[in-house]
C-alpha cells in the first residue's frame, strides 16, 4: 500500500514539473555510395543509380541540388553548359546527313510537259526540213529544174514531202490562191429566183395586204383521197353471228 501511495504522489509532481524537451538536430541528406562489390558494374554503366536519404521538408532542395544547373556560390554567375550539338559530335564518329526531299510532279503536269516537248521537237524538225527544201529550190539542181524565187508549195516536186508549220509560213508572200471563191449576189445559186416564185411573191404580197396572211401550197404532189380512210381497229360484227 505504501508503494502505491508513493507512486500516486509522484505523478502530480511530474505533471507540475514536466521534463525538458530535447531538441533533435535537423536531418541532413546523405548520399549513400554504392557497395564495393558493385564498383565494377558502376564503372561499366555510364548512368549509375544514386540513392539519397532526405527529409520531407528538404526533399525539394535535394532534388534541385542534384538535377538543377550548377551555380558558383562565390561569384553568383551561372556556368554555361556545353551545347548538346557539340557533345553529340564529339561522342559520335559520324553525323546524320539531312534528308533530301524530291519534288513530286503530278500526273497532269507531266503530261503537259511531255506535250510541250513533243511540240518543240516537231517545230524544230519542220524548220530543218523547210530550210533544206529552200536550199534545194534556190541553189541546187539542174538549170531546167530551177524554181522561181517566189516559193510556192504548188511548184515543189510531189516526190518531196515537206512539212510546213503555220508559224513558219508567210502567207502574204506565198501568193496562194484560195480554193474557196467568194460568192456574189449574182452568182449565188440560192438567190436565183424563178418566174413562178416571182408570181407567187406578188400573190403573197396582195394576200397579205388584203387578208393579212397567205397560205403556201403544199409541196407534196402525191394524190390523196378527198376523205381519209378509217381502219377497222375493232370488229363491227361478232364472230358468232358470222358463223
Swiss-Prot record:
It is found in: Nucleus. The modification Phosphoserine is found at residues 83, 95, 148, 152, 165, 167, 178, 218, 221, 238. Transmembrane segments: none annotated. Phosphorylated on serine and threonine residues by MPK6. Signal peptide: none annotated. Disulfide bonds: none annotated. Residues 1-49, 69-98, 138-162, 180-243 are annotated as: Disordered. This is VQ motif-containing protein 33. It comes from Arabidopsis thaliana. The lineage of its organism: Eukaryota, Viridiplantae, Streptophyta, Embryophyta, Tracheophyta.
Amino acid at each position: 500500500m505504501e508503494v502505491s501511495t508513493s507512486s500516486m504522489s509522484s505523478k502530480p509532481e511530474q505533471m507540475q514539473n514536466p521534463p525538458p524537451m530535447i531538441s533533435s538536430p535537423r536531418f541532413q541528406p546523405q548520399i549513400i555510395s554504392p557497395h564495393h562489390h558493385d564498383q565494377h558494374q558502376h564503372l561499366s554503366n555510364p548512368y549509375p543509380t544514386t540513392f539519397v536519404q532526405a527529409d520531407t521538408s528538404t526533399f525539394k532542395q535535394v532534388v534541385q541540388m542534384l538535377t538543377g544547373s550548377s551555380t558558383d556560390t562565390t561569384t553568383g554567375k551561372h556556368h554555361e553548359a556545353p551545347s548538346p550539338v557539340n557533345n553529340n559530335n564529339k561522342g559520335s564518329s559520324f553525323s546524320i546527313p539531312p534528308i533530301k526531299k524530291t519534288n513530286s510532279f503530278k500526273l497532269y503536269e507531266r503530261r503537259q510537259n511531255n506535250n510541250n516537248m513533243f511540240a518543240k521537237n516537231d517545230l524544230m524538225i519542220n524548220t530543218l526540213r523547210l530550210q533544206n527544201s529552200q536550199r534545194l529550190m534556190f541553189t541546187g539542181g539542174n538549170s531546167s529544174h530551177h524554181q522561181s524565187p517566189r516559193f510556192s508549195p504548188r511548184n515543189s516536186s510531189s516526190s518531196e514531202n515537206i512539212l510546213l508549220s503555220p508559224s513558219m509560213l508567210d502567207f502574204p508572200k506565198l501568193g496562194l490562191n484560195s480554193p474557196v471563191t467568194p460568192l456574189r449576189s449574182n452568182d449565188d445559186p440560192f438567190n436565183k429566183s424563178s418566174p413562178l416564185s416571182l408570181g407567187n411573191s406578188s400573190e403573197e404580197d396582195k394576200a397579205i395586204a388584203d387578208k393579212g396572211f397567205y397560205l403556201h401550197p403544199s409541196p407534196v404532189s402525191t394524190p390523196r383521197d378527198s376523205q381519209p380512210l378509217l381502219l377497222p381497229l375493232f370488229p363491227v360484227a361478232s364472230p358468232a353471228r358470222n358463223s
